[in-house]
Amino acid sequence: MAPRARRRRPLFALLLLCALLARLQVALQIAPPCTSEKHYEHLGRCCNKCEPGKYMSSKCTTTSDSVCLPCGPDEYLDSWNEEDKCLLHKVCDTGKALVAVVAGNSTTPRRCACTAGYHWSQDCECCRRNTECAPGLGAQHPLQLNKDTVCKPCLAGYFSDAFSSTDKCRPWTNCTFLGKRVEHHGTEKSDAVCSSSLPARKPPNEPHVYLPGLIILLLFASVALVAAIIFGVCYRKKGKALTANLWHWINEACGRLSGDKESSGDSCVSTHTANFGQQGACEGVLLLTLEEKTFPEDMCYPDQGGVCQGTCVGGGPYAQGEDARMLSLVSKTEIEEDSFRQMPTEDEYMDRPSQPTDQLLFLTEPGSKSTPPFSEPLEVGENDSLSQCFTGTQSTVGSESCNCTEPLCRTDWTPMSSENYLQKEVDSGHCPHWAASPSPNWADVCTGCRNPPGEDCEPLVGSPKRGPLPQCAYGMGLPPEEEASRTEARDQPEDGADGRLPSSARAGAGSGSSPGGQSPASGNVTGNSNSTFISSGQVMNFKGDIIVVYVSQTSQEGAAAAAEPMGRPVQEETLARRDSFAGNGPRFPDPCGGPEGLREPEKASRPVQEQGGAKA
């Protein structure tokens, strides 16, 4: 029994082992293999892949499964994957003729295509322009996206007359259907031309299409013409005045500038004819500014008799209608009224023709309205002669001072410029000694130079209280007769020598006191023994102030033997120095007054400046 039991135990163990092995084999046959698209085998295990739109951050292990994360913006994954990062979307560049057909997302990629008229070329992987079909060819429809155009010839009854990559062939126009006849048959490149059976006629309103434009054009031209005419008239009336005012302002500004520079400059210097014999040289006080005036009807004027006639003395009838050129004082108002006149140049004075010397110089009475022959002062250099200030002056060598061969009161008179009157009066010796007297004795004024000395002379016109003024205006602000006589008597030499002294002696005596009753002349004093200028402001550019010029009869222009050389004009630095004041020297005897004239100095001894038109 025992051996039989031992034999049964190994058999049981063998059967148990076979059962275990069978179970293990069944288990191995039931487990699926890792061949699916959603799984992958790792470390003897079959693990899951990541779904579309996610990427695998870490793979599976023996104890854990795979780890998946979503894609970022502009990234995608379109399938189950075991990728460690997502893919980027394509960029559809419009500069390369690309457009996005499908925008795409995290699970779908973006799709780009060429724009219309372009197609994708595999040669360059870029978009190219579609082929354009020539006339007679048409594009085959339907057009395919990203495909080049396919051109085909137009069939009969169809035409294509332009280059196009999209247009297909068009049919000809059916003229019969339109009720017209065919004028030209169509071709593959041109359409058929139809014509109406009725003759064509122009619309009746066609000319009216251009009529409004023509009317507008004519209206515009008329308005422009009228505006041009109005502008021309206004410019002629106002533009010239504005231009004249502008030029006047410029000239006035330049005159002031030049006047400031020349205020202390030289003055006009003039030499005149030397006189011979016992007759002394006549000297007078003359005004530089000249004006024209007409004699009043009751004025005494010269006759050919050479002396004052009865009509002059008695106040009888005078000649009517006779005009004369006058010399008068110029007030500030009169100068300003004439400020718009053209300023004469130096050449205009130099080129004037000379005038005859048989005419006299006259003065208007104060306050009379006058018109000056020139509105601006004359400028003369320091080395120039005063003769250019008065046109037509010549040296009269043979003439005598105060030679009364020409009449003093009435003469056959021819008008001439005032400056010529001034110079001719000086050159011919007609220098009335009552010219500067404030209250002259008219009994001595019209003294005929041909009468013997000592004889009584009838006045030219009468006293200033009862008649018009004589040739020289009274009230010029000059010293009285008695004061001038006393001053002249003190200045003459004690030895009773000839009254004619050299210029140096007269200049030395000129430093004495001013005449009694008159204040010394204010302003700049310039010149030498031959000429003296006095002004209270600008010398050559003045307004309202009177310039008195003292002219000596000693001339360097003639061939006189006794003439002294002309000195150079000197500008005095201060008002205290007046050594060159020529009017302060001893006076020459009056040749027209006889022996008494040799002893008595002349009345017009010193020039005095007037302070304006009011004192005249």
UniProtKB/Swiss-Prot annotation:
The organism's superkingdom is given as Eukaryota
Where is the chain membrane-spanning?
A: 213-233
Where the TNFR-Cys repeats fall, as residue ranges, is 34-68, 71-112, 114-151, 154-194
The segment annotated Disordered runs over: 468-536, 556-616
Extracellular side: which ranges?
30-212
Give residues annotated as binding Na(+).
C133, A134, S160
Sum up the protein's function in the record's words: Receptor for TNFSF11/RANKL/TRANCE/OPGL; essential for RANKL-mediated osteoclastogenesis. Its interaction with EEIG1 promotes osteoclastogenesis via facilitating the transcription of NFATC1 and activation of PLCG2. Involved in the regulation of interactions between T-cells and dendritic cells.
Record disease entry: Familial expansile osteolysis: Rare autosomal dominant bone disorder characterized by focal areas of increased bone remodeling. The osteolytic lesions develop usually in the long bones during early adulthood. FEO is often associated with early-onset deafness and loss of dentition.
Q: What is the official name of this protein in its record? A: Tumor necrosis factor receptor superfamily member 11A
User: What is the source species?
Assistant: Homo sapiens (Human)
